[in-house]
């Protein structure tokens, strides 16, 4: 199955993916972090089920496109040591602060909100590998992005693989122009693994 960025996911069911992570779009920005650790001080703590594999960004004249590949069960969350760990929301930095926009992933609504630091919180306060915000509540609602979350149907390290895809109209992000930088961050409520990307708008 190919995601929006033309990446064909394939795995042999063991430790790592057996495919090329490179997107087909020449303008796409992406970062790959396909690894995990059983040790608390190395991401992804807790093993493969908390691994965030990759993040992508691209745009056209009308929309910004983002995709995340993870072994973390999204949007259902992971039951871990007596607690349900929830997916985080997608945080965006467009020059107004480290989290000046957010997209609701945990509730699977795709709600886009203009946020500030006080709107963000950590959704799971126990079993955390790192302190820091993961989800938002409040802010100023702008509209809804197109959000598609699906099970890619492949197994890596004994756990499924999930793809989170977002398409958001550029006007919802205050019409960024060519060369403008967008910072992206996604994690889960315990921050056992965190992935970041600085992308740029092309045209």
Language model feature labels by segment:
Residues 3-22, 37-124:
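Surface-exposed, glycine/proline- and aromatic-rich loop segments on solvent-exposed faces
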Residues 6-8, 14-22, 56, 127, ...:
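Ser/Thr- (and often Asn-) enriched beta-sheet segments in non-cytosolic proteins
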Residues 27-50, 132-140:
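Short, solvent-exposed secondary-structure boundary motifs
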Residues 66, 90, 164-169, 184:
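Residue-level detector of buried hydrophobic side-chain packing
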Residues 109-161:
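Short helix-loop boundary/capping segments
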């Amino acid at each position: 199955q190919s995601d929006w960025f033309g990446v064909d996911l394939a795995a042999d069911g063991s430790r790592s993916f057996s495919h090329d992570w490179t997107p087909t779009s020449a303008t796409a920005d992406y970062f790959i972090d396909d690894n995990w650790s059983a040790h608390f001080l190395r991401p992804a703590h807790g093993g493969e089920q908390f691994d965030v594999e990759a993040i992508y960004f691209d745009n056209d004249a009308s929309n910004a496109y983002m995709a995340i590949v993870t072994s973390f069960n999204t949007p259902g969350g992971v039951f871990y040591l007596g607690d349900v760990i929830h997916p985080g929301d997608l945080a965006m930095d467009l020059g107004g602060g480290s989290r000046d926009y957010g997209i609701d992933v945990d509730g699977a609504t795709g709600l886009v909100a203009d946020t500030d630091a006080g709107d963000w919180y950590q959704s799971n306060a126990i079993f955390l590998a790192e302190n820091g915000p993961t989800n938002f509540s409040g802010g100023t609602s702008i509209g809804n992005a197109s959000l598609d979350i699906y099970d890619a149907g492949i197994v890596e390290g004994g756990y499924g693989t999930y793809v989170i895809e977002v398409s958001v109209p550029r006007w919802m992000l205050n019409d960024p122009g060519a060369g403008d930088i967008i910072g992206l961050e996604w994690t889960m409520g315990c921050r056992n693994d965190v992935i970041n990307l600085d992308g740029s708008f092309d045209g």
